[in-house]
A protein has these predicted regions:
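N-terminal beta1-alpha1 cap of cysteine-dependent amidohydrolase-like domains
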Residues: 1-110, 120-128, 132-176, 182, ...
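Conserved G/P- and acidic residue-centered "switch" motifs that form tight phosphate/ATP-binding loops
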Residues: 113
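The feature captures the ABC ATPase H-loop/switch
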Residues: 116
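Active-site-proximal beta-strand elements of phosphoester/diester hydrolases
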Residues: 216-219
């Protein structure tokens, strides 16, 4: 059997401020191929080009990546202001219904940064436009200057629930992570379980309650140094295992239909 196919949800950019592209960080593809053991497939996040139904039938799982544009606040009942930054409505139109469909089908996904926020919004939650403006919260944004190593350096602790999903993945109730986000969870969706918190109370790790498939998602960026990092590697390994289990189940179902 071939490796599972993981659809990597892309972002839309203007290359050199004029050439439109669908792009995804190389670190995402490397983590999926080298740590999850799956085939990375970059997906154009535009409903004019591909449908959610087609993606569900073409892929065994999905990586909901980070990105500069934010989920539009209209998706959670709030009015857009400058504080919410830039948006990517085409990605919203793919990612949000994709999350809901995966939850119902038991198809695995792994949300990272914006992807983590998409999972919450898709399941009925809302977001703060700027975490650092809240009383008692730290600045979770990446440094404006410096090398990649400096931007992705370990910066804070995340405490996860004892006996919970992330404790089982990490084998520990405290881990150290990077942080490169401005927005964060305000209200958790009705089925969203906040399983990990930063020391300032910011939600950092979630999953969907009673979902039949893998839904673990994180606010930090585990794709950085994924093969060597003791926190990142088990996340991508667990996601790969879930994708293989889903692929195997689909293959068994197809054989039953054909027999």
């Amino acid at each position: 059997m071939t490796r599972p196919i993981i659809g990597i949800i892309s972002n839309s950019y203007l290359l050199n401020d004029q050439y439109p592209v669908h792009a995804g960080g190389a670190m995402n593809s490397e983590a999926i191929a080298q740590v999850s053991g799956c085939i990375p497939l970059l997906v154009p996040s535009d409903p004019a080009l591909v449908s959610v139904a087609e993606l569900l039938d073409s892929c065994d799982g999905f990586l909901l990546t980070g990105g500069r544009p934010n989920v539009h606040p209209e998706e959670y009942g709030e009015v857009a202001t400058e504080a919410y930054g830039d948006f990517d409505r085409a990605r919203d139109a793919i990612a949000l219904p994709l999350v809901r469909a995966c939850v119902e089908r038991g198809q695995p996904f792994f949300g990272v940064c914006r992807g983590f926020q998409e999972v919450n919004v898709a399941m009925g939650g809302s977001l703060y436009p700027e975490i650092r403006d809240l009383p008692g919260r730290m600045n979770h944004r990446m440094p404006p200057d410096g090398t990649m190593e400096e931007k992705f350096e370990i910066r804070h602790r995340v405490s996860v629930s004892e006996g919970g999903v992330f404790h089982k993945i990490f084998g520990a109730t405290e881990v150290m992570t990077n942080t490169l986000h401005g927005q964060g969870i305000k209200e958790a969706g009705p089925r969203i379980v906040i399983d990990g918190l930063a020391d300032d109370g910011t939600p950092e790790a979630i999953y969907v309650k009673d979902a039949p498939g893998f839904t673990a998602s994180v606010q930090w960026h585990p794709e950085w140094n994924a093969a060597a990092d003791l926190v990142s590697r088990p996340l991508f390994e667990a996601f790969g295992d879930a994708a293989r289990a889903y692929q195997s189940g689909q293959a068994r179902a197809a054989r039953r239909i054909a027999s």
